[in-house]
Design a protein with these regions (language model features):
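Extended, well-ordered alpha-helical scaffold segments
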Residues: 131-134, 186-199, 299-311
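Active-site Asp-x-Gly
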Residues: 165-166, 178, 209-212, 217-219, ...
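Conserved catalytic motifs of the protein kinase core domain
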Residues: 47, 103, 208-209, 230
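ATP-binding pocket architecture of kinase catalytic cores
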Residues: 30-175, 179-182
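A short helix-loop-beta-strand connector motif used in the catalytic cores of GNAT acetyltransferases and
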Residues: 38-40, 204-209
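Juxta-kinase regulatory segment immediately upstream of eukaryotic protein kinase catalytic domains
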Residues: 1-28
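ATP/Mg2+ or Mg2+-diphosphate-binding catalytic cores
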Residues: 2-5, 287-320
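Hydrophobic alpha-helical segments that form the core
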Residues: 276-289
């Protein structure tokens, strides 16, 4: 946690920052809920909108991997800036000082269309299925982007990557395990570390680093064309890294329509099944730890603990 916790940005200060960045005097501000980092929608007279993000309140407990998301998103947008078929939004401003808003902030855009969470209640089951299929197609295109090494995208700016997916995955899992240990959550920590070590060979079968968005599928993150029922982009690329695309949360419990859009899902051979259970282990562990750090009433922890138990049982039975 930063030594000087960010204060809540003043709306007038946000408006001035938006006007300067977008070179427009007509910028309306709307604070959005449902996001870890504080988000404001900046709307101009041109019909597009932009997103301004600042750090969470100092009362919000962050996990290790949730720090530095503004810088991570800026890097992701730069990496994807040559792919207009994937990302129409661009990095407008990254200000890592606290002088202007009392917190570092990022502005990205322009975004066309609607945030899926805003329009979902008004859509028919057929429209929702079309959007799920379109999301699968979008993720397939994202997954085609190759990187130089496994690990953070920021390795292109001097951060060392790894040539081992097994090592990278173990490092990512270890970060969440330590968050759980710090909070004294009752979990089988050493058993989880052990199953990752025992299934290292299955992870090492992944040799080509590809673009992964770890946290992709939330309705608040997906931008859609509500008339044509298709996905046009994402609101947040901060969880991007180079790894195995099947680790993304959109493969945690995919719908049939998503699977139709993406194509073949990884449930064929033994190594694929082992990797998928390892990824279920990661996401269910993350859900349990996150619930402890930031309690909610959505019942996520109980289901996540069941998934965690199932993954551990399958991985223990399938050990080599």
């Amino acid at each position: 946690m930063p030594s000087n916790p960010p204060r809540s940005p003043d709306v007038s200060a946000i408006q001035r920052a938006g006007q300067d960045a977008l070179q427009s005097k007509n910028v309306s501000i709307e604070k959005l809920s449902g996001y870890l980092y504080r988000n404001c929608r900046l709307t101009t007279s041109k019909g597009f909108f932009y997103i301004l993000k600042t750090r969470p309140s100092h009362n919000c407990r962050l996990l290790r991997h949730e720090e530095g998301r503004l810088e991570a998103e800026a890097c992701a947008l730069q990496v994807l800036s040559t792919r207009p078929d994937l990302v129409s939004a661009r990095l407008i401003v990254l200000d890592t000082t606290t002088l202007r808003l009392g917190s570092s902030y990022l502005i990205s855009g322009p975004f066309g269309g609607s945030i899926f969470a805003d329009v979902e209640p008004s859509l028919s089951p057929q429209a929702l299925a079309s959007i799920d299929k379109s999301l699968g197609q979008y993720v397939r295109r994202l997954s085609s982007v190759a990187g130089p090494a496994f690990g953070p995208l920021r390795q292109v700016q001097g951060y060392p990557g790894s040539q081992s997916w097994a090592r990278t995955f173990a490092t990512m899992l270890e970060s969440v395990l330590r968050d759980g240990e710090d909070a004294l959550i009752n979990l089988p920590y050493e058993a989880m570390r052990d199953v990752v070590r025992r299934h290292r060979a299955s992870l090492e079968k992944i040799t080509q680093p590809k673009l992964v968005l770890l946290e992709l599928s939330a309705d608040e993150n997906v931008i859609v064309d509500a008339k044509n029922h298709r996905v046009t982009g994402l609101l947040d690329y901060a969880s991007a890294f180079w790894g195995d695309p099947f680790m993304s949360d959109c493969f945690y419990k995919p719908t049939a329509s998503f699977a139709e859009g993406f194509g073949k899902l990884p449930n064929g051979d033994t190594d694929e099944r082992i990797r998928q259970y390892l990824y279920v282990l990661y996401h269910s562990l993350l859900a349990v730890v996150r619930q402890c750090y930031r309690p909610s009433e959505d019942g996520e922890e109980l289901e996540a603990r069941r998934d965690l138990t199932t993954a551990m049982r399958q991985l223990s039975a399938g050990s080599r």
